[in-house]
Amino acid sequence: MVPFLVLAQQCAPTVAPQTMAAIVQVESGFNPYAIGVVGGRLVRQPVSLDEAITTAQSLEAKGWNFSLGIAQVNRYNLPKYGSTYAQAFDPCKNLKMGSKILEDCYRRAIVKMPGQEQGALRAAFSCYYAGNFTGGFKTKPGSPSYVQKVVASADVTTKPIVVVPMIRKTPDAAAAVAAPVKKRQPADRNSVLVDLHPSSQSMPATGTANAPVRLKTEQPATTDAPPGKDNTDGVVVF
C-alpha cells in the first residue's frame, strides 16, 4: 500500500498533493473503483476491478453518463487521454487524468482572476465538477456546495492506496517463511444495480455481486459535455 500523498506526487505532480486529496475525498472517498452515475445511483459501489469494468460497460451500453475512478473522471474524457475503463480504474492513471483536468481549469481561472490564487483555485474546483466557474458554488437545501465540500476537506486524513509494489530480489523475512494463503474466489464479472432516484436520503439497499444491472424504464439523464480539457504547458495548481 502506498500513502495517497506519495502517489499523488508521483502521478499528479502539477497539482499540490493535499489539493488533489481534498478533491478525491469528495469525489470518491479514496475508492479507486467508484462510479458516479449522472441522474442515477448505484445501490452499492463495485468491490473489484472486474466488477467495476463490467458495471461501466453496462452503463455505457444503456446510454448512461457517469464518472469513474478515484478522481471521478467523466467517461467522455477517456478517449482524450487514450484510456480504457481498466486503465481509468488504476489509481495512478486516474489521478493523472484528473490532475490534467483540474490544471486546465485552474489555468483558465487564473487568467480571469489574476493575482487571486485561492479564488482561482476555488473556481477551478467548480470547473472540475460542473464544467464552468459557477455551478460548483451552488448549494442545495441542507447541503453545502461542491466547492465548500472540497475546501472543508483541505485537511483530510488520506488513506493508503493499494498498488503493485516493485519487485526485490530479496524477499521479506515474513514472506520467506509464510505458509501459502488460500485464494479467495474472484468476484463475479456481473455489475451492480442502479437506483434511478438519487434524491432519496435513505441508504441504498445492498446489491448482490451476481445480479446484473437492472434499469427502470426512464431514459438516462441528458447532460452537457463533461468538464475539463487537455493542457499544453506545465502549471502547478496549489
Swiss-Prot record:
The reply to whether NADP figures as a keyword in the UniProt entry is: no
Cite the entry's keywords alphabetically.
Virulence
Location of region: Disordered? 197-238
Domain of life of the source: Bacteria
Q: Which CDD domains match?
A: LT_VirB1-like (cd16892)
Record-linked InterPro entries: Lysozyme-like_dom_sf (IPR023346), Transglycosylase_SLT_dom_1 (IPR008258)
Question: Record's SUPFAM superfamilies?
Answer: Lysozyme-like
Pfam families (UniProt xref): SLT
Bias (Polar residues) occurs at 198-209
| Further information | Transcription is turned on at the beginning of the stationary phase of vegetative growth.
- What is its biological role? The virB operon is essential for intracellular survival and is not involved in the invasion process. Constitutes a major determinant of virulence in mice.
Identify its protein family. Belongs to the virb1 family.
Q: What is the designated name of this protein?
A: Type IV secretion system protein virB1
- Source organism of the structure: Brucella abortus (strain 2308)
The organism that produces this protein has a lineage beginning with: Bacteria, Pseudomonadati, Pseudomonadota, Alphaproteobacteria, Hyphomicrobiales
